[in-house]
């Protein structure tokens, strides 16, 4: 599925960078998945994997039943979306409300608090 900026221009959205080899980032993905289910569609999500292997990325997405749009082009941190968004580590994230960035690079605990306050 293609995602455009207009898909993220209303309501609350999170863009997150993750990797299969980084436990903290896969844990953050699972938290976002729970928050998305709890929000009943009010939290939009796009994730970007920095895995070199698309298979490793797909294995995590399948294992955790993650179905939102995910980008995994195998280019690690050279990936165009990673560079354009200024994501520099894993986990990393950008929280957007009504088309405006309200937070970035939050820890999982801070991401959780900020999502709950803004839903």
List each model region and its residues.
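Conserved hydrophobic packing residues within short motifs/helices of P-loop NTPase cores
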Residues: 15, 46-48, 71
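Solvent-exposed loop/turn segments at secondary-structure junctions
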Residues: 20-22, 51-54, 101
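Structural microenvironment flanking redox-active thiols in thiol-disulfide oxidoreductases
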Residues: 26-64, 76-82
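Short active-site neighborhood of thiol/selenol oxidoreductases, capturing the structured segment around
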Residues: 3-26, 32, 44
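Signature tryptophan residues that serve as conserved aromatic anchors
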Residues: 18-21, 57, 68
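Thiol/disulfide oxidoreductase modules built on the thioredoxin-like
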Residues: 66, 73-118
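N-proximal helix/coil linker or "cap" segments that precede and/or mark the start of modular domains
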Residues: 1, 6-10, 55, 59-62
């Amino acid at each position: 599925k293609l995602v455009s900026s207009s898909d993220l221009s209303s309501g609350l959205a999170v863009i997150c960078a993750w990797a299969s080899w980084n436990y903290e980032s896969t844990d953050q993905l699972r938290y976002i998945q729970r928050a998305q289910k709890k929000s009943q569609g009010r939290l939009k999500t796009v994730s970007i994997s920095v895995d070199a292997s698309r298979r490793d990325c797909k294995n995590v997405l399948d294992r955790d039943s993650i179905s939102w749009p995910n980008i995994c082009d195998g280019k690690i941190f050279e990936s165009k979306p990673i560079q354009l968004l200024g994501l520099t580590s894993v986990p990393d994230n950008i929280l957007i409300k009504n088309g405006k960035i309200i937070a970035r690079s939050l820890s999982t605990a801070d991401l959780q608090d900020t999502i709950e306050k803004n839903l």
